[in-house]
Amino acid sequence: MNEKTKVQVQGVPETMLQTLYARAQESKKPNHHIYDERAIEVVSRLDYDFSKAESDKAMSLGVIARTIVLDKLVGDFLSHYPHAVVMNIACGMDTRCYRMEGKYDRWYNIDLPETMAVRSRFFEEQGPIFQIAKSAMDASYMEDIEYHGEPVLVIIEGLTMYLSEADVKQIFDILDKRFSKAVVLVETMSPFVVKHIKEKSIEKSAAKFSWGVKNGAALEQVIPRFKNKRDVSLVEGMKVLMPIYKVIGKIQAVRNFSNKICVMKK
């Protein structure tokens, strides 16, 4: 029997294990809507109590819906720009770099040192996938990004709702100072949801939602150097998972309250 690896994380970093578990569980279904071989492999090696994630079906559905939406957006970008540089901010245990392997020149997974200490135990990433163990609010991480004018894609998934508006501004300011052009796919949460909705697994991990924005147009007011090209509601991913969303997804209130991927461009 293979020895399992025990990890100690709490607060926001703990959510990365819950989302990893959600992707692994979906991938093991006969009729899976995403397939994440790396997630299955890592979960099988972890000595960790996944009961919080197992009991939170709403969180799991949201994770898979988000994965469906982002995989399409990232895949579409890379099909147009096969020599792109991709930056995954607050990557956690995300494995999209493997699902998109061969479609980009360089991929940088960026997260806090304590998070990357866990990631590096399961993923050896030394090119063309690289790890940067720094905060996205620490401008020095840009020193580790090799850039020669290639198209740039930045992914910010599952992060902004745990930050302040000042933090979000700082992240985009660092991007603005480094790149003359860039596309950012950033997940946002409705202010109403931040204030009134609680996910069971998130609450149990001691992570707290703290910031939200209505849509990409409102986000543009916060970061005016980046223009909102469009918003993609996670309802689009839910339509794949649950056909009833093809009906209820037309209700504006449902779309308003759902998380969005805002496509921001400089």
Per-region residue spans from a language model:
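Rossmann-like AdoMet
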Residues: 1-87, 91-134, 148
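Short amphipathic alpha-helix with an adjacent loop that forms part of the alpha/beta core around
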Residues: 140-149
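A conserved beta-strand element that flanks and buttresses the S-adenosyl-L-methionine
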Residues: 154-155
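A short, conserved alpha-helix within the catalytic core of class I
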Residues: 162-175
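Conserved beta-strand signature within the Rossmann-like core of class I S-adenosyl-L-methionine
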Residues: 178-191
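Short, glycine-/aromatic-enriched active-site segment of Class I SAM-dependent methyltransferases
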Residues: 191-207
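Short alpha-helix
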Residues: 206-236
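Core SAM-dependent methyltransferase catalytic element
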Residues: 239-266
